[in-house]
């Protein structure tokens, strides 16, 4: 990191600082966020906010053209394939180094399973609730798995922000779980919630496997493999399960294109963030996706937003603010003491 380089600790002999005040360079060091805080901010702005548009846009494409989740997954995977050109230009193998190629493919498979579960859930469950269950389960599973497998714990304030954010998610999704309809519709809705939970579990496992990959081009390699594995698994099923469906109007094509671009941006930002910060904290910051999805659900879709949704969204926003703010304040305090 730039702030720890010896050059930044040398006194400036050409422009001496006044004896009564601290050097301006020390002030710059004091205010410079660490890699972990940068990762959390990237996850918040580049990962959570764009991902919040994906659920509503997917629902709009489904309502306009009856576009199933399998076709939407294939369209998204197509946006990952051009990354092969970047890998070729850099001279890197498309599938990664031979010794860790299996882990990279397994990570890509987990990503595809998470995406497929999310797209299936959003077609039978309100978009905000589907995002809530997926992000909540990914956060809890990431915290438990990282603690058990990597022995990497969290501070008290991190736990406070994480658990408070999960409380907000429970406030959002709780009333809907208690009022499931009886009969076939209720079964489909319950299965949608189960798919969202499994998607969060697959996401947390994928993040842990991703953190174990150590080679220069691991981010573009996993992104390309996610598209390749998704296509290899989805295209055969497309002709077995049902007749292929294409978007029927400009709105559907626009939604599909926007979903592909936004998910690729979100994937890249989350992939960067999880190498800098604790996976559970990254997943907690990604709860901002839920707030964005609820706002778009209210303004763009014929789906009501209950008072509990608004209350839970406020709790989520307050708690995901605690995590990067506390990390940044700790860094500043530590640098002042130095």
Swiss-Prot record:
Residues 1-28 are annotated as: Disordered. Keywords: Membrane, Repeat, Transmembrane, Transmembrane helix. It holds the Pfam family EamA. GO terms for cellular component: membrane. It comes from the Eukaryota. It is a multi-pass membrane protein. Its main location: membrane. The chain crosses the membrane at residues 37-57, 67-87, 105-125, 160-180, 190-210, 221-241, 250-270, 281-301, 310-330. The keyword DNA damage does not apply. Residues 49-174, 272-325 form the EamA domain. It is found in: Membrane. Belongs to the SLC35G solute transporter family. The gene encoding this protein appears to have arisen by SVA-mediated retrotransposition of the SLC35G6 gene in the primate lineage. This is Solute carrier family 35 member G5. It comes from Gorilla gorilla gorilla (Western lowland gorilla).
């Amino acid at each position: 990191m730039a702030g720890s380089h010896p050059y930044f600790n040398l006194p400036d002999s050409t422009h001496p600082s006044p004896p009564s005040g601290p050097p301006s360079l020390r002030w710059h060091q004091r205010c410079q966020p660490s890699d972990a805080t940068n990762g959390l901010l990237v996850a918040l702005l580049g990962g959570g906010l764009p991902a919040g548009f994906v659920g509503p846009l997917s629902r709009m494409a489904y309502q306009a053209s009856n576009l199933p989740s399998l076709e939407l997954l294939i369209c998204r995977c197509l946006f990952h394939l051009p990354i092969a050109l970047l890998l070729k230009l850099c001279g890197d193998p498309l599938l990664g180094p031979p010794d860790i190629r299996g882990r990279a493919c397994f990570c890509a498979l987990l990503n595809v399973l998470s995406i497929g579960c999310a797209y299936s859930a959003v077609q039978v469950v309100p978009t905000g609730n589907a995002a809530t269950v997926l992000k909540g389960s990914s956060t809890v599973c990431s915290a438990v798995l990282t603690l058990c497998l990597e022995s990497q714990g969290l501070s008290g304030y991190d736990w406070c922000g994480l658990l408070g954010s999960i409380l907000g998610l429970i406030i959002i999704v709780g009333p809907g779980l208690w009022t499931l309809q009886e009969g076939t519709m209720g079964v489909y809705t319950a299965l949608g919630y189960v798919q969202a939970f499994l998607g969060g579990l697959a996401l947390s496992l994928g993040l842990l496997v991703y953190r174990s990959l150590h080679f220069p081009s691991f981010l573009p390699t996993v992104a390309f493999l996610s598209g390749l594995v998704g296509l290899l698994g989805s295209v055969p099923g497309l002709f077995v399960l049902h007749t292929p469906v294409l978007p029927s109007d400009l709105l559907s094509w626009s939604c599909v294109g926007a979903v592909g671009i936004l998910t690729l941006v979100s994937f890249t930002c989350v992939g960067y963030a999880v190498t800098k910060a604790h996976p559970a904290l990254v997943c907690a910051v990604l709860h901002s996706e839920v707030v964005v999805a609820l706002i778009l659900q209210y303004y763009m879709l014929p789906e009501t937003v209950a008072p509990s949704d608004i209350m839970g969204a406020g709790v989520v926003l307050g708690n995901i603010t605690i995590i990067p703010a506390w990390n940044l304040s700790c860094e500043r305090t530590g640098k002042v003491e130095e």
